[in-house]
Amino acid sequence: MSIISFVYFDLGGVVIRDLTIDENAWSRMKRDLGVPPSFDQEFDAYYDKIELLVQAGADIDSFLPEMAQKFHLTFPIGYSVLTDLTSRFHKNESIWPVIDAAKKIGKIGLLTNTYPCLLDKIKQANLLPAVAWDVIIDSSIEGTQKPEARIYEIATERAGVAPEEIFFIDDRPKNLAAAERVGWQTFLYDPRHAEESSQHLMLQFMHA
């Protein structure tokens, strides 16, 4: 293995268990919102479109009126997508020893496509390990997101090491492919087999 001086972790699907851990989790959320199965495809396309805007800094809850009108939904007073999502997330304690191991061989950071204020909600829910991240790259703050080249340029600069010394853990192949194009080392994490993925990472870091 090449030298590792900095490890970037993805947030959802790696450091925490989000809706990717269960193929039915997103469907359950849609049913809870009142989206009928017959509208699934249309709702998914709509959500994918607005999510790109949200991950670049737009407020997800600002889309609720449009969402309600478009899909004939009724949201409770005070409803927040951020709060709802956070309540459906869980700790991924299998990754915690991996983060500790990474901290021993270099610096660590988060590199995440996320929504404004969602990381704060996740912290408040105590879903993260008690660790001091050296760098946090939040797409909603940077205005660019994975797999766009710019976010990897920013992350490389803030890591302060050569690109080939950066190790990146993510659960989406397209994000890893973009990282490899700038010279990073990568690992594809499987959120549906988190314990197994974490064990493989531990073995790699033990020999780093």
Regions found by a protein language model. Name each.
Residues 1-45, 181-182:
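Active-site neighborhood of HAD-like aspartate-dependent phosphohydrolases
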Residues 1-9, 115-116, 120-208:
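Asp-based, Mg2+/Mn2+-dependent phosphohydrolase catalytic module
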Residues 10-13, 56-57, 102, 110, ...:
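Generic structural signal for small/hydrophobic residues in well-ordered secondary structure
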Residues 24-28, 45-49, 62, 66, ...:
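Alpha-helical elements of Rossmann-like donor-binding domains used by nucleotide-donor carbohydrate transfer enzymes
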Residues 25-29, 64-67, 82, 86, ...:
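Hydrophobic alpha-helical core bundles mediating ligand binding, dimerization, or RNAP-core interactions
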Residues 31-46, 71-82, 163, 208:
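Short, surface-exposed acidic
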Residues 49-81:
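A metal-dependent, Asp-based hydrolase signature
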Residues 76-109, 149:
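Short, acidic loop-to-helix structural element flanking the phosphoryl-transfer center
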